[in-house]
């Protein structure tokens, strides 16, 4: 087994790619958010290249808004050694419902991510952590880099320190790279249109079977046009998330 490849127990990733992307309206009027390009390739392509690097062979894309554009793109057989299944999971479905709609295609453990963020996270280590902890829901925790100046001040509101574009924020946030066990479906009411990130995850956390895998490397989401331009600039100057060879 190549050193970067994952354990054969887990080779499936679900990518949530059906949202409207309203904060990136300049681009998403014409295409779904996961098809917005970075370096002349859809961000969805970058995400799949990342998982391909770690040996994933089964990709399930939960499409919705303008999903036909995603299907058309992957009909070109860009990834010859990977099975890519693009499924229409509904225009207005929230994340938990999208997952419910592909449940029958899922193995006991699987990866889940969003179609709008890139990172240099080590998926092999993330998966190993998931199994080592006997977790049913593993979240990648990331420390987002601020693009704004950070201000520190005292009780009188006098500024004591100003840091331009601070590289550190105290709290981890969800990086959107998950490993899940199918036991999580016990916490999803399939009769409701739910956000996975709200009631289901809140209740799973109470079981003591949810863990955070801390990632200190690069991570960046693409929520706005500013984010897209930032990633375009990085692609030209510093390919921080490109861990694959070609």
Go through the PLM ranges and name each one.
Residues 2-15, 23, 37, 41-114, ...:
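Conserved N-terminal catalytic core of the sugar/cofactor nucleotidyltransferase
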Residues 44, 70, 102, 116, ...:
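Residue-level signal for inorganic ion chemistry
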Residues 110-111, 118, 124-127, 131, ...:
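Catalytic-core segments of class I nucleotidyltransferases/pyrophosphorylases
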Residues 35, 86-87, 137, 162, ...:
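Generic preference for hydrophobic
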Residues 26-29:
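Conserved catalytic-core motifs of eukaryotic protein kinase domains, centered on the activation segment
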